[in-house]
Amino acid sequence: MNHFELFGLVEGFELDTRKLADTYRQLQTQFHPDRFATAPEREQLVAVQRAAQINDAYTTLKTPLRRAEYLLSLRGTDIRGEQQTLQDTSFLMQQLEWRERLADLKGEADPEGAIKDFRQEIGHDHQLLMQQLTLTLAAGDDLIAADCVRKLKFVDKLLEELERFEDSLFES
């Protein structure tokens, strides 16, 4: 049984997050290990394993990039944990520009304003990539969708680094 089936959801990138959360709570209650405290040891073990499976499936499905990776793996394109580099030269150049810009933020006269502008720019590109990911997954174009996931991982990492940089400004 795959994660979508476990939660009674149609297999796809777009999903009903309310149904996901509601079903998660129901399954958590149904298979919580405490409910099996007086059951035979074998049933307790099954309950613990099932609870772990439910938690993992929920975390995977509620997180868009993890959901996309999982969906791609179900379709035969497993990119989870891969270290493949992108072949998209323009995106690679964009990465370099963003990295330089992040490094240059330290010398800005108004770092807070520069961070805000930079975050908006990256957020806009993130949104465009998410739209492309949604469309390519719906169309079954898994190779392009996999590239979108790779790009989104980079953008997410850059946003995390920007957040850490911003935090360091306030710690000084």
Curated annotation (Swiss-Prot):
Coiled coil: none annotated. One of its GO terms (biological process) is protein folding. Residues 2-74 form the J domain. It holds the Pfam family HSCB_C. SMART domains: DnaJ (SM00271). NCBIfam families: hscB, PRK05014.1. PANTHER family: IRON-SULFUR CLUSTER CO-CHAPERONE PROTEIN HSCB (PTHR14021:SF15). Interacts with HscA and stimulates its ATPase activity. Co-chaperone involved in the maturation of iron-sulfur cluster-containing proteins. Seems to help targeting proteins to be folded toward HscA. This is Co-chaperone protein HscB homolog. It comes from Aeromonas salmonicida (strain A449).
